[in-house]
């Protein structure tokens, strides 16, 4: 796997302006391998800052309880009518936590919020998107 580069100064400035816009403080994000990782609390602040509502629904055709596979569809909408749909999934292959449905839901919501806020234009992910994105103590 190719090693990620450090975050460049232009990207740092863009992220800083996003962080200020959404009221993010240092506890709401961290850097890991050249990527900004937004915490659950940070995702909630971004959603409020964008006036986004998110609805979640299970996707039966991509869910198999007997195989411990779950898929949740998130639909994010702004007051201006912009809409984004995306998915969050969880299985034994990508989740080591004992509550896979919750993880699928968190991943779906986080992805929808990051997409509708345009933060995915930067090297940004939510901490819920992968176990390896959890902040190292």
PLM region descriptions:
Residues 1-137:
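Polyanion-binding surfaces on beta-sheet-dominated domains and ring/shell assemblies
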